[in-house]
Swiss-Prot record:
This is Valine--tRNA ligase. GO terms for cellular component: cytosol. It catalyses: tRNA(Val) + L-valine + ATP = L-valyl-tRNA(Val) + AMP + diphosphate. Monomer. It is found in: Cytoplasm. ATP binds at K557. CDD domains: Anticodon_Ia_Val, ValRS_core. It comes from Shigella flexneri. InterPro entries: aa-tRNA-synth_I_CS, aa-tRNA-synth_Ia, Anticodon_Ia_Val, M/V/L/I-tRNA-synth_anticd-bd, Rossmann-like_a/b/a_fold, tRNA-bd_arm, tRNAsynth_Ia_anticodon-bd, Val-tRNA_synth_C_sf. Belongs to the class-I aminoacyl-tRNA synthetase family. ValS type 1 subfamily. A motif ('KMSKS' region) lies at residues 554-558. PROSITE patterns: AA_TRNA_LIGASE_I. One of its GO terms (molecular function) is aminoacyl-tRNA deacylase activity. Residues 880-944 form a coiled coil.
Amino acid sequence: MEKTYNPQDIEQPLYEHWEKQGYFKPNGDESQESFCIMIPPPNVTGSLHMGHAFQQTIMDTMIRYQRMQGKNTLWQVGTDHAGIATQMVVERKIAAEEGKTRHDYGREAFIDKIWEWKAESGGTITRQMRRLGNSVDWERERFTMDEGLSNAVKEVFVRLYKEDLIYRGKRLVNWDPKLRTAISDLEVENRESKGSMWHIRYPLADGAKTADGKDYLVVATTRPETLLGDTGVAVNPEDPRYKDLIGKYVILPLVNRRIPIVGDEHADMEKGTGCVKITPAHDFNDYEVGKRHALPMINILTFDGDIRESAQVFDTKGNESDVYSSEIPAEFQKLERFAARKAVVAAVDALGLLEEIKPHDLTVPYGDRGGVVIEPMLTDQWYVRADVLAKPAVEAVENGDIQFVPKQYENMYFSWMRDIQDWCISRQLWWGHRIPAWYDEAGNVYVGRNEEEVRKENNLGANVALRQDEDVLDTWFSSALWTFSTLGWPENTDALRQFHPTSVMVSGFDIIFFWIARMIMMTMHFIKDENGKPQVPFHTVYMTGLIRDDEGQKMSKSKGNVIDPLDMVDGISLPELLEKRTGNMMQPQLADKIRKRTEKQFPNGIEPHGTDALRFTLAALASTGRDINWDMKRLEGYRNFCNKLWNASRFVLMNTEGQDCGFNGGEMTLSLADRWILAEFNQTIKAYREALDSFRFDIAAGILYEFTWNQFCDWYLELTKPVMNGGTEAELRGTRHTLVTVLEGLLRLAHPIIPFITETIWQRVKVLCGITADTIMLQPFPQYDASQVDEAALADTEWLKQAIVAVRNIRAEMNIAPGKPLELLLRGCSADAERRVNENRGFLQTLARLESITVLPADDKGPVSVTKIIDGAELLIPMAGLINKEDELARLAKEVAKIEGEISRIENKLANEGFVARAPEAVIAKEREKLEGYAEAKAKLIEQQAVIAAL
């Protein structure tokens, strides 16, 4: 084997070999249980980020683990067309390169342009997924707009429409005036900002007066421009100031519209003035109030967010109405919305109706892609009736057909599903699945799989002109069909029969409603088992937290704290990293701050760590459902782990290749250490499998690390040296056999998490075991064997380890050279301790570097010594001639003084109010941690001073 572990040399060639050999495909053995995971489809033109790397590592670990258990495994791969994101990328591209807009191209030509862009950049993310070691079946790769999936989408739309579960209606949506499309709640980013609350007088009609004799109500609003669309004023029905006015009217300033005063809980007596203006067409809460009181809806804005020339007036059901005039005062027409705000305030003030302006903290919704303030907008959209679909989806989780890991996410799911709103599925974009609906000139709507079917079903001759709906479906609509459409539905395919319901879905909790819930609803509606019972899309939902930076901040381009997973695999120089973080920025003014932060964090760029180290780190950090703060030190630690495993394997091979390892018969004697490591290994298998079976990848990674590093490398390899240097033939055979057996099993155990290094080493080790198979990927996963757990060997070895560690600690504390042989005395020995010493003298002397071991008679106190107590005995190392008492005390005093200096420095820092107020919580916690560490170190040094002073 190569002397040094170099992941760059082994990873890519290995992956190509696995893929070429077809090892990622299902084994097709239908006598075995199936295990299937659907990959959450990443954006086709995107690139891999830490969230992908994290989730895909978890999925690949599960898939490899189940594949090694002989299951018929499928990891279904595919990408998402990502409507709005992809369209925006291409729009920006043609604007930058050609100075054109999509309208210059026209719909067909622009869509062709997007397909070109997909062909050009669509392979990036799949190439990156290969670099991660993902064992997905590439031959089954799907795309949400491929022909098969597009047919499934049409089929679902048509069936839901025919069942009256899809309808077209006028409703309020989040409208992005820059992108000119409806967007989902997930694409809205709420930002805190300082604003104003305007208090405006609305004169009472018909001579009415308030309880305190005023002839007006004062309405408080943060959006005075929407006053032009008010159709009511709400007061709380319990409010003594106004309850007698319910049913009376006010005259709306500027427009002179007569609008009713309604009693509604939405008006809070404690907030503002207790009177709230109601604008059902421009506010989500007002829309609901308007529905409750059958108020008309008046839309005053264009799709660009400007004031209309004349308003659109609708009744509460969304039908056009003439209950109010559609006139808008000329001075406000065509004004941009924020200019209109100023103009309305000035006009109200001129009439003497502006009572006061108060500063007010606001939460303002912005579109996360367009970057402008979102406007609630009354538009015609297509909707799915969600309550009917939600009922079985709630029951599936209630009765345990679907389980959430961790369980607490069930509550989040229930709270949303039990109060579900109809789902707006239309988007005013060009890229996506076009809605399969056609209109004739009279405005009648026809829904079908294609125009030909529509004409045939509705007896429409060629003379009837039809135009297809311009809108496309929300990307989440096609994603909701992902578990079954990818397997060939609506055809009843073998794949659907074998792999559906799927086993586990791995997802971030942020899309529990947008994706998880909708998959459950859609799947249960369309997929039934042979008895007609609705099928669930998956049995388990494993929820991951978000990966944040080392300070707990969300990773984002604007913060400049994004780490590309492949930069940790391959390494990246500082100039390249700076270019990546500051090039093509939406907000170039942040570049300087980002540059400084990056230079401080990565002065030499990022070292290459290899894929296995990255995967191990991700698995180790995967504590269920909590957000994860990324830690480069952990990554370095797991890179060191891979080195340690490599070097340990080289040690095993150097001592076993070309030797008799007992695999072809011959007498074998197992030493205590051999019996101990076999027992340890089997206990490790048991605990590790339990962790993987319960989705505790962090615990599994910890178990693997602890056994490999501490038990196998640090102890067992050391404990084999006495046999290797002077054992009998039978003992040598026994130890070599154990070395090879445990290493080979350990490689299989670790393979799901770190596939590349384990396959590479296993190719050498398999020869010694007489295994002829081509790959570790298809080897059986280790099984726990209780007969291998020798309790006596475990107890005896743990005692020996305690004794060796005690001697090593005395050396370290007393500053005695590691190579200097020592005399060991044992006082107050139990029978067990004496037996252990007598049976394992050779081990003890070699590993603790002892000249002699003496068990003192019961009444012998022994000479002046440093002592340690272990189970059933007291260990003594006589100090005569070992140290110079004065020198040692002086050295310790110097150490104590140095540590006291550090302690007072940190205490002063933490006592500084300015520092504590400004510094992030994580920095303060780090300082406190350092302080604790120094205090512990000081206590240990003082203890040592006392021991030496007493000599």
